[in-house]
Amino acid sequence: MKHVTTDLCDANEPRLADGTLRVMAPVFRAFGKQQAFAGPAATLKIFEDNSLVREALESPGQGRVLVVDGGGSLRCALVGGNLGLLAEKNGWVGIIVNGCVRDTGELDVCDIGIRALAAHPQKSQKRGAGERDVAVQMPGAVVRPGNWIYVDADGVLVSEEKLGA
């Protein structure tokens, strides 16, 4: 069953008012075959180094969404075609990147949903720097591990708990 972000907002106005349901800023471009996806969040806080992205995506996704706070950097890509395929293979439903992706043609055939600020041809560094499973500041909303993420063509929602259809 698909969750529609507009319907979720309309049905949960008290949660929007008290901040237990948040809307990310409308700054993301869509990549990947899945235009709508939902699941609990796993989080990363990194900057121009995607080592932890690979490490996370090598683990079983179990229907989760990987939320990557890349600091909004537009100087390199944090996710590319190989990582998109890895995410699909390991059961992740989506990736949201506060940063860039590359290999967009490859990403667009991956059977997951991806949101990112832009595309950039340069790869990131590989130093192993960053934090995993921490609260991250995404554009317009804080995301904590285990928050529920709902994504479709109208936007990205962050909920403190799983919402009904």
UniProtKB/Swiss-Prot annotation:
Textual note on the cofactor: Divalent metal cation.
Gene Ontology terms describing biological process: regulation of RNA metabolic process
EC number: 4.1.3.17, 4.1.1.112
Top-level taxonomic group: Bacteria
Cofactors (names): a divalent metal cation
Chain positions recorded as substrate binding sites: G80, G81, N82, L83, R102
EC class: lyase
UniProt-listed Pfam families: RraA-like (PF03737)
Keyword Lyase: yes
Matches recorded under CDD domains: RraA_family
Cross-referenced SUPFAM superfamilies: RraA-like
Binding site for a divalent metal cation: D103
UniProt entry tagged with the keyword Metal-binding: yes
Keywords, in A-Z order: Lyase, Metal-binding
GO molecular function, one term: oxaloacetate decarboxylase activity
Catalyzed reactions: 4-hydroxy-4-methyl-2-oxoglutarate = 2 pyruvate; oxaloacetate + H(+) = pyruvate + CO2
Sequence similarity: Belongs to the class II aldolase/RraA-like family.
Record NCBIfam families: NOT-MenG, PRK09372.1
General function of this protein: Catalyzes the aldol cleavage of 4-hydroxy-4-methyl-2-oxoglutarate (HMG) into 2 molecules of pyruvate. Also contains a secondary oxaloacetate (OAA) decarboxylase activity due to the common pyruvate enolate transition state formed following C-C bond cleavage in the retro-aldol and decarboxylation reactions.
Subunit organization: Homotrimer.
Protein name as it appears in the record: Putative 4-hydroxy-4-methyl-2-oxoglutarate aldolase
